[in-house]
Amino acid sequence: MKEKRLIIKRSGYPSKGEIVIGTVKRVLDFGAFVSLDEYEGREGMVHISEVASGWIKDIREHVKKGQKVICKVLDVNPKRGHIDLSIKDVNERQRREKLQQWKNEMKAFKWLEIIGEKLNIDFKELEKIGKKLMKEYDSVYSAFEEAAFEGYEVLAPIVGEEFAKEMAEIARENIKPKRVKVRGYFELKSSASDGIERIKKALLEAKKALVNGVEMKLEYVGAPKYRIVVEADDYKTAENVLKKATENVLKAIKKLGGEGNFIREAA
């Protein structure tokens, strides 16, 4: 017998343009019907023209019953209960992000189960708690993130102090702070006989900008380019370190008789 798992679904309908995850329930010649995993009792339809780009000879070569699919909501008609979906309109970045979001949410549901077992709370009550968290934070995982970084106190008014403390404990054990990266590259030149050594010396000045909790990588791209990558807990810190590192390097190369400039790369 399959073990029952806690799955908390949203009521209502998805919004037009929303990226959703679903399970293919039926595949017909003209399209596929998809059960929306995040919504209670909602099913959408992917017309054959929205399955993939180009002409499709056999839809079953692209989608199969039981398959997980990431879709974009094209249109919603609550009166008729219709939800039009597209698979082809979802790009690779959206697909990856949605899958990760879903995996995170499934983990969060499991964490609620663990707390429920510890505090002797049944699935029905856990579902109510989960829906409260979804209403406040949009997802249960986001609520756990809040507990990890802000403390149990922020959740206590929603789920009670005892439950909030358990959430914070699990969150701190399992959720690590997200790191951010900023990058760019130097173009450094020196016509001196020991020009390469002078450039290396100038680049080492970048490390003097480092502060606690920040990491920096310097990479040779190809003369005269040298990439710098700064990683920190937040963009403000990363930007400040990158700015200081840039100033240090450009000042040093000039002092050593060379020339240089810095070009910022998009995040």
From Swiss-Prot:
Entries under CDD domains matching the protein: S1_IF2_alpha
Keyword Acetylation annotated: no
Superkingdom of origin organism: Archaea
InterPro entries (alphabetical): NA-bd_OB-fold (IPR012340), S1_domain (IPR003029), S1_IF2_alpha (IPR044126), TIF2_asu_arc (IPR022964), TIF2_asu_C (IPR024055), TIF2_asu_middle_sf (IPR024054), TIF_2_asu (IPR011488)
GO MF annotations, alphabetized: ribosome binding; RNA binding; translation initiation factor activity
Keyword terms of this UniProt record: Initiation factor, Protein biosynthesis, RNA-binding
Residue ranges constituting the S1 motif domain according to the UniProt record: 17-88
The keyword Signal belongs to this UniProt entry's keyword annotation: no
Quaternary structure note: Heterotrimer composed of an alpha, a beta and a gamma chain.
Protein family according to the UniProt entry: Belongs to the eIF-2-alpha family.
Role, per record: eIF-2 functions in the early steps of protein synthesis by forming a ternary complex with GTP and initiator tRNA.
The protein's name: Translation initiation factor 2 subunit alpha
Species of origin: Archaeoglobus fulgidus (strain ATCC 49558 / DSM 4304 / JCM 9628 / NBRC 100126 / VC-16)
Lineage: Archaea, Methanobacteriati, Methanobacteriota, Archaeoglobi, Archaeoglobales
